[in-house]
Amino acid sequence: METWWKDAVIYQIYPRSFKDTTGNGIGDLKGIISKIDYIADLGVDAIWLSPIFTSPMQDMGYDVSNHRDIDPIFGNLKIFDQLIKKSHKNNIKVIIDQVLSHTSDQHPFFILSRSNKTNPKKDWYVWADAKSDGSPPNNWLSIFGGSAWEWDTSRKQYYLHNFLKSQPDLNFHNKMVQKWVLSIIKFWLEKGVDGFRLDTANYFFHDKKLRNNPALSNKKINSNPYYQQELKYSINQKENLIFMKALRKVTNRYKDIVMIGEIADPKVQAEYTSDNNKLHMAYSFELLKENFSNTLIQNTVLDFFKNSKNGWPCWSFSNHDVPRHVSRWSNSKIHEHNFAKLTCAILLSLKGTPCLYQGEELGQTQTEIEYDEIKDPPGKKFWPIDFGRDGCRTPMVWNKKEKNAGFSNCAPWLPIKKQQLKNAVEPQTCLLYTSPSPRDLST
């Protein structure tokens, strides 16, 4: 059973949008529990939950202010225990997102760290003095736009944030930070989880010398300047691999645990999954790209196993960060429903572990979000060039005849639109009823 994950089908749940039981328009843990039978009927082996921890929700839970508790909008630790119990009773393993490279700026540690330069958490985050002209320490950029450095008036220093300014990066060069992060992993293992999906797994360490990132040789202008730098010094540091080994040692003390790392660069994936002493799997971005072709899929799979001697990939066509693939890869010559079945069959036939995103089993399409409906920070910043991620995060369509499609008895946090009602669990429009189950296809 130690490699159960190699034969598994994983089902990703975005809790905010799965099922609301409290009447606030936001999905919750009880909602997931209420649908475990549905998930079991799909034939999947594990669920992966996007962040459910205490958070101000500036980035929908990826800004964590307490890594050891459940945000009240989702429930509490007691309800989480119930979710683990019911999932395991149905032979479904539970994998949870872990956001470890940074915290929320509302985390007690950061509040203390920014207060002065002498406090106990003074170097738990990445602080640096301004240049002589007052500008940031280097040219590093945030993936969400602008400089990766934010000036703090209390400490009179800049702090690093690879993402939103409300998501300050932890200083992993500090051994106490490493010890604290390992204790978080132990906490959730003791709660009975079966694995972790490590968000931005190659972002933990930064170059101590804070050297400038070089420009990419490709002169093509991107709508987001972040992608015009070679991220040589801001991420992918050698110390990161050493820490992955420390994480693996912790998980190895428990039975049948899997550790999946979110890593965009295929070459880096090979490093992180080699030698059976770091990540168990790399969550690949290569098949989340804009254009669909048999060449893309063939080359991606072949390249992974060519570069990674004994690594193992986790493949997805859709997730909570990219437009749904049925729309992203749309072709007017192919009916959407048929295309959804085709791509599902392809995903489940690839060597590696497939990960289905909620609604993918329905052939769900991307929701068109108007500007005044946008909740996602990058969507607001880069619109209309980039519409953000809300379109793939709209609520699950359970029954097209019920109020709010059976998701909630009040207005949902993101709209459910007519186009998406066509792909509902009830009546039986699910791909589940028109093709073999994911479990059958992957074996």
What kind of feature is each model-predicted range?
Residues 1-435, 439:
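Active-site and adjacent substrate-binding regions of carbohydrate-active enzymes
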Residues 441-443:
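N-terminal low-complexity segments that are often proline-rich with Ser/Thr-Pro
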